[in-house]
Amino acid sequence: MTQTPEALTTEQFKQAIIDKGQYYHIYHPFHVMMYEGKATQQQIQAWVANRYYYQINIPLKDAAIMANCPDQRVRQEWIQRMIDQDGEYPDGGGREAWLRLAEAVGLSREQVISEELVLPGVRFAVDAYVNFARRASWREAASSSLTELFAPQIHQSRLESWPQHYPWIDDKGYEYFRSRLSQARRDVEHGLTITLDSFTTHEQQQRMLEILQFKLDILWSILDALTLAYVHNEAPYHSVTQERVWHKGLFK
């Protein structure tokens, strides 16, 4: 009879989660290029415009988690994530802060909101994340958010390197990164508690680690799409036309 592998201890499981940080998109060549001051203004703008699509879908992901969660106490805490991103009327929250970043790098908010610059590969990756959150159990979807463990480092890196390398970016554009330093740490504490309490068998823990890898794949794939289009100059249909003929989103 095959013996069932033993579950990791809480500390071992936590360390296995932390070890996934080696695959975080902070190490993607596109991010490294931005940190090292080697990105052009067009490349910075492309990242901001495409990342906007990720930003506006995060509240939809969080809404899906809450819709699937019967635990009132969890919902009471999780809803703060939606408020952080969407704000409380009339404040625009993280979404508005991101649009100010877009303006700071030389984009118009109208162009960013139109999503005309969002690459199909970016759209597909983000949509896959939202659809996963809708279909998965709330505990699994919540655990996918644990890439936030590594987020403070990435925000701090931008705050330290961008002003030095890109003095043409207006300082007001950095508000989003500053706000996320504390918000991400708070969110991690809640998400990590849920995860460590929810996944207690070997099989459950391995599935959770695979879910976390799925989320890391999404973040990495977003940058792969940007690299192809804005580093190698091979945007979709580049061999046919230089126009942005790809679809701009079917459900808006």
Swiss-Prot record:
Keywords: Oxidoreductase, PQQ biosynthesis. It catalyses: 6-(2-amino-2-carboxyethyl)-7,8-dioxo-1,2,3,4,7,8-hexahydroquinoline-2,4-dicarboxylate + 3 O2 = pyrroloquinoline quinone + 2 H2O2 + 2 H2O + H(+). GO terms for biological process: pyrroloquinoline quinone biosynthetic process; sulfur compound metabolic process. Pathway: Cofactor biosynthesis; pyrroloquinoline quinone biosynthesis. Its EC number is 1.3.3.11. One of its GO terms (molecular function) is pyrroloquinoline-quinone synthase activity. Pfam families: TENA_THI-4. PANTHER family: 4-AMINOBENZOATE SYNTHASE, PQQC-LIKE PROTEIN. Ring cyclization and eight-electron oxidation of 3a-(2-amino-2-carboxyethyl)-4,5-dioxo-4,5,6,7,8,9-hexahydroquinoline-7,9-dicarboxylic-acid to PQQ. HAMAP family: PQQ_syn_PqqC. Belongs to the PqqC family. This is Pyrroloquinoline-quinone synthase.
